[in-house]
Amino acid sequence: MSIITDVYAREVLDSRGNPTLEVEVYTESGAFGRGMVPSGASTGEHEAVELRDGDKSRYGGLGTQKAVDNVNNVIAEAIIGYDVRDQQAIDRAMIALDGTPNKGKLGANAILGVSIAVARAAADYLEVPLYSYLGGFNTKVLPTPMMNIINGGSHSDAPIAFQEFMILPVGAPTFKEALRYGAEIFHALKKILKSRGLETAVGDEGGFAPRFEGTEDGVETIIAAIEAAGYVPGKDVFIGFDCASSEFYDKERKVYDYTKFEGEGAAVRTSAEQIDYLEELVNKYPIITIEDGMDENDWDGWKALTERLGKKVQLVGDDFFVTNTDYLARGIKEGAANSILIKVNQIGTLTETFEAIEMAKEAGYTAVVSHRSGETEDSTIADIAVATNAGQIKTGSLSRTDRIAKYNQLLRIEDQLGEVAQYKGLQAFYNLKK
């Protein structure tokens, strides 16, 4: 009854209006699961391959019909007949079927769509919530959200190099209250921007993309919004960055070239100067987390940054680790970063995603479950965050339904868990000396 009888993929659109995959899995019992695949704008060079058609006459070359065909004509044939509850066996079968180290043959987008749909179908078959199916009886931790309320870098047209300015409502007693803190700060920020005559249009992840005078102007405006909403910076709410440094790192000159986004006259920093600058910001403002503060291939820089700031700030590897246990294992061994960003489409299966989270926790690294800038209404990452007790989630600002869908799912989960639910807040940063 739990045997897979049909697998079907179709091309749909993501939050940027670009094609992506939606996959459906059916079982003998009638149980059903659907998975949709996100897509990134700033991507690590070591990420699993997102298969695109390359036909410029259709969606500007971004079509996903090849990946759709791979699901319908290759993967489906391989996994029909499997028990839908055997997630690892199905994921391993798809990895073997692809046969490449980066899923470049079938496409990580094709494989991931199936992986998510299989998990959802299994949960449907067992008549349990997805988070409960994936995590078991010990599932209880609601994640502290990193809310990206200012978008810069590759996520907007704002002249700021750093890609994300985030607020983290660590002082809230519950996830529901944390979400309220964030929403109130978001609206307070909008009022401040309007009063300054700055733009209130939003970027890919729902945050504002105003033309600030620079990074510090952005941070100080966020602090003003936190205070205007009635909260205390550095107590109720902290600040975080996603620098996405690989987006403005000049490999030939080996410098961090802020002029790429901030224009003529902006800073050009060596690796050592980049670390000095980040430390200066940490000492000046209530910053608790920095993602991709160094380029993905600047291992010496990462190690130096971790040695300098790793005990008081969460240093998250995104492009640096690409949700890959090989890169994470090296980082752990060499003392680079102290946290990993978890993006399911960077690696391509739920099995490998869970392995990365487990490896991080065993090493004392935190794991931050994350969306992508090109999202869908699929809320699987909310369930993954709770299922793994990851403790942190990054899923955008307090606008755009593609972001709010994840927050609303977390509200439902918190309700369902009832008294068992725990919101860790500041305790989610267990690797810091607070």
From Swiss-Prot:
Subcellular location: Cytoplasm; Secreted; Cell surface
Binding site for (2R)-2-phosphoglycerate: Q163, K343, R372, S373, K394
Keywords, comma-separated and alphabetical: Cytoplasm, Glycolysis, Lyase, Magnesium, Metal-binding, Secreted
Residues given in the record as Mg(2+) binding sites: D242, E291, D318
Any Gene Ontology CC annotation: extracellular region
GO biological process, one term: glycolytic process
Manner of cofactor binding, per the entry note: Binds a second Mg(2+) ion via substrate during catalysis.
Catalytic activity: (2R)-2-phosphoglycerate = phosphoenolpyruvate + H2O
Domain of life: Bacteria
GO molecular function: magnesium ion binding; phosphopyruvate hydratase activity
InterPro entries: Enolase, Enolase-like_C_sf, Enolase-like_N, Enolase_C, Enolase_CS, Enolase_N
CDD domains: enolase
Cofactor: Mg(2+)
EC primary class: lyase
Similarity section: Belongs to the enolase family.
Function: Catalyzes the reversible conversion of 2-phosphoglycerate (2-PG) into phosphoenolpyruvate (PEP). It is essential for the degradation of carbohydrates via glycolysis.
HAMAP family (UniProt xref): Enolase
The name this protein goes by in its record: Enolase
Native source species: Streptococcus sanguinis (strain SK36)
Lineage: Bacteria, Bacillati, Bacillota, Bacilli, Lactobacillales
Gene that encodes it: eno
